[in-house]
Amino acid sequence: MALHLLLLFGACWVQVASPDSLQRTTMLPSTPHITAPSTSEAQNASPSVSVGSGTVDSKETISPWGQTTIPVSLTPLETTELSSLETSAGASMSTPVPEPTASQEVSSKTSALLPEPSNVASDPPVTAANPVTDGPAANPVTDGTAASTSISKGTSAPPTTVTTSSNETSGPSVATTVSSKTSGPPVTTATGSLGPSSEMHGLPATTATSSVESSSVARGTSVSSRKTSTTSTQDPITTRSPSQESSGMLLVPMLIALVVVLALVALLLLWRQRQKRRTGALTLSGGGKRNGVVDAWAGPARVPDEEATTTSGAGGNKGSEVLETEGSGQRPTLTTFFSRRKSRQGSLVLEELKPGSGPNLKGEEEPLVGSEDEAVETPTSDGPQAKDEAAPQSL
């Protein structure tokens, strides 16, 4: 908090002190000859105003904390004025003052150090900043040179840092480090121009630019590293996607092939079952035909025997009917279950007729011998078939 308050106080002091310095810089060039101030006046002005360019016009370039340049085209009058001012400043603050002959070289290439005051007091540090502006008679001074001074009188409070800037667009920034006998760290004052400067002078400016460049480079590298990481993560995805697509493309035809094969197998099984059912019906029908043929052959053979035994005494008409039945029985290819049923129906009809023909049984028993004789005579005409028919009768 103390540092912030001191900074605010210093800024206000700079704003208050700047119009005074402007008045002094504008009033001094009007007098061609300036006498050196006495030591008492310098001592009275030193606590309130910074030593150096505060009481000198814009032509003065020697300041304890600034590095400025003076062109070589100075007149002897100006050098004498500068030397007189230097002697007055040296008498007030006990600073080493260069000789008038070496003032040009010192002002052009060297920077003055902060004087170390011998008096130690408990007063707070006084910090003042003097922005340099271009006046009407500021011909030999380089434009845009800002110098700031800070005088510390050996206090125990932490030192402060004051930064002043000039509104000029050209000129280097001056930064000086002041070593004091206080217990705190050294005080650093830096001044910089608000506008762009053609040449960068001073370590703070170079370090600031280098820090900006390093931060930009670091950000660039971080962005590039992120890009590489994203590309590295995208590569496996691109390599995995074809495998997944290929596996999916392979699975689909496999499933389709399995479905088709299962459908074909089901159709084949159904067709085979139908074939088996059809062949089973044919075999059963064929077996029935064969069995039916045998049964039908046996049936008609028996029916004519019964009819022959029952109708032999009735006359020749019945015998002719028996022959017709025998003739029909000799054709086994035409016999079926239906014909067999007919034969059974005929046998049932004959059985029903037997009880009704009871009185004729005695008459029928007598001609049986004659019927047998006829049956014996018939083999001669019919051949071996008649013998086969005669065998069951004898049995």
From Swiss-Prot:
Spans within the Extracellular topological domain: 20-248
Biased composition (Basic and acidic residues): 385-395
Intervals of motif Nuclear localization signal: 276-290
Classification via InterPro entries: Leukosialin
Parts of the chain that traverse the membrane: 249-271
Compositional bias of kind Polar residues: 27-56, 89-111, 145-154, 167-196, 327-338
Residues recorded with modification Phosphothreonine: T333, T378
Subunit details: Interacts with SIGLEC1.
Protein name: Leukosialin
